[in-house]
Amino acid sequence: MKPLEILLVEDNAGDAVLMRQVMGESKIPVKLHIARDGEQALNILSDAEFRPDLIILDLNLPRIPGSVVLERFKSENIPIVVFSSSWNDAEIQNALKLGAREFIQKPTDIQEFIDAVCGIIQKWGTPEENGVASAG
């Protein structure tokens, strides 16, 4: 099985390090790419050579908010999981309305997070499995 290409969009360095460690220890083969803000995420995603299987997106980002990234890529057939510290019902509903497949609130149990990511991939498939061309 080829590794899942996951783009993690997270401005908190501690959370990004933890996610890299958790994904590295999971049973899923993963290649994790990290963007530190919304602008960097949009730049990475504008590269036609890069097509992630999943985007894990924080909403509270510097430069360009996660909601803008979410709205821009909702039609790209890439599953997007919002992983945010927001507990605001309106913000959660807006993220789901904009196309997030799942909203996971921080902090969360690590195993629950891994199970959620696995479940999303199983339920929605990867862009490649859904007929979207993938680079490489």
Put a short name on every predicted segment.
Residues 90, 108-118:
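C-terminal output helix
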Residues 62, 88:
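The feature encodes the CheY-like receiver
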Residues 13-33:
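Two-component/phosphorelay signaling modules centered on CheY-like receiver
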Residues 83-84:
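Hydrophobic/aromatic residues positioned on beta-strands within the core alpha/beta folds
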Residues 10:
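Conserved acidic carboxylate
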Residues 65-78:
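Short amphipathic alpha-helix used as the core "switch/output" element in two-component signaling
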Residues 57-58:
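Active-site residues of response regulator receiver
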Residues 20, 34-54:
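Acidic, metal-coordinating helix/loop segments flanking the phosphotransfer/catalytic sites
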